């Protein structure tokens, strides 16, 4: 990979809003501001079918000495992270010192936090607790399965180590089911090699539109396209060609787990995933911290992390989500260059800025300018004070899927 000396993109201009404790602050920025040169540089791309992945490095090679975060998949696998429906919060509450008489405490001698009164299950809220001794990093687009519906994380956030239960904003990606399949939620994939998150077009509806119906529409469209893409792969099997309704599911996660779909996703990602260790070794050597993503010649997304270690831990999950996006049919554009990818990163960030977070834990900002939107998750935990994840996307128009089942409308 060749490092080109081009003006880079800095997230530093995004600083300036004070953290807001569990509420949002919105302000109009003064206008587009040019980014300081040299913060990020784009490398020569890795080609994988209709995918083009441009690795991104910090110009000075500087990275945090350590990124002490636990990922969602790691936490669920070890049992250190639990997520459940809102109505089951009582079982997750941490023990409190015994206060009062037995009669005052009742049979359950744990004190139920006032912020979590008895309540029913909710489509767009789960309750999560981090039992580990590390802060938990959650990325928008990550999937948890089980409960009464599969869900997707709505926005990036950090959950402190040893936390009390928190309300977690989510979107349903399995319309039509509201019956419990399990008491707690699990990871979407059975193994790390097949991990995934929702593809960029679905992530956009969750992160930008923040609209459940839009998420359902995009899930429906993605499932239809997965079925269509998988049909040729299954046509040689006993029983003839595969129907576009062959999966018989409204769940995005179950669609991605379908063997024929998984085969197509792996095929789309093959040039990257077959040499995964070699690619990751090269990324580490170059001190890469993220990628700019182009699908069929159109630059659509960028994911940047605090360091190479975090990028490597999310690599499979990210690449398979990009590969799923490449299954969406469409016309191909001219192959973008390194300069095109650099311009995408270097585009001014201005317009309207929205900020929210948790004092002393994290700050999350959204900036929209022109045809792009940028999302920045900054850690405020002791010893950090840096951007943990930056997502940037090219806004695409929402398409209403005519003929979608009523549940998607």
Stretches found by the model and what they are:
Residues 1-6:
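Positively charged n-region of N-terminal signal peptides that target proteins for export
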Residues 8-19:
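Bacterial N-terminal signal peptides
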Residues 20-135, 141-409:
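Intrinsically disordered, low-complexity segments enriched in small/polar residues
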């Amino acid at each position: 990979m060749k490092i080109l000396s081009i003006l880079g993109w800095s997230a530093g201009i995004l600083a300036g809003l004070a953290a807001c404790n569990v509420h949002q602050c919105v302000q109009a920025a003064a206008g587009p501001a040019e980014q300081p040169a040299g913060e990020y540089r784009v490398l020569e791309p890795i080609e994988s079918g209709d995918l083009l992945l441009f690795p991104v490095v910090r110009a000075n090679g500087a990275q945090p000495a350590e990124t002490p975060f636990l990922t969602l998949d790691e936490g669920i696998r070890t049992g250190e992270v639990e997520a459940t429906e809102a109505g089951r919060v009582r079982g997750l509450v941490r023990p409190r010192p015994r206060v009062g008489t037995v009669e005052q405490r009742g049979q359950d001698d744990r004190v139920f936090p006032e912020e979590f009164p008895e309540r029913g299950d909710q489509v767009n809220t789960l309750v999560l607790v981090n039992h580990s001794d590390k802060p938990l990093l959650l990325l928008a687009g990550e999937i948890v399965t089980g409960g009464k519906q599969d869900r997707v994380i709505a926005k990036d956030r950090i959950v402190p180590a040893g936390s009390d239960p928190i309300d977690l904003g989510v979107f349903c990606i399995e319309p039509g089911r509201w019956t419990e399949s399990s008491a707690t939620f699990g990871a979407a994939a059975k193994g790390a090699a097949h991990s995934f998150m929702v593809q960029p077009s679905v992530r956009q509806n969750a992160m930008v539109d923040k609209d459940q119906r839009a998420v359902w529409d995009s899930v429906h469209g993605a499932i239809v396209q997965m079925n269509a893409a998988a049909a040729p792969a299954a046509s040689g099997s006993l029983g003839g060609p595969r129907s576009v309704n062959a999966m018989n599911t409204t769940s995005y996660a179950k669609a991605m787990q379908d063997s024929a779909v998984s085969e197509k996703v792996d095929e789309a990602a093959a040039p990257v995933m077959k040499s995964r260790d070699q690619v990751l070794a090269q990324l580490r050597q170059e001190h890469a911290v993220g990628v700019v993503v182009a699908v069929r010649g159109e630059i659509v997304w960028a994911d940047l992390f605090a360091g190479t270690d975090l990028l490597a831990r999310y690599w499979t999950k990210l690449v398979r989500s990009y590969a799923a996006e490449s299954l969406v049919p469409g016309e191909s554009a001219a192959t973008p260059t390194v300069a095109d990818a650099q311009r995408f990163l270097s585009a001014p960030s201005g317009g309207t800025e929205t900020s929210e977070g948790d004092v002393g834990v994290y700050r999350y900002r959204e900036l929209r300018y022109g045809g792009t939107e940028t999302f920045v998750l900054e850690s405020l935990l002791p010893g950090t004070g840096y951007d943990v994840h930056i997502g940037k996307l090219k806004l695409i128009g929402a398409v209403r899927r005519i003929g979608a089942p009523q549940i998607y409308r």
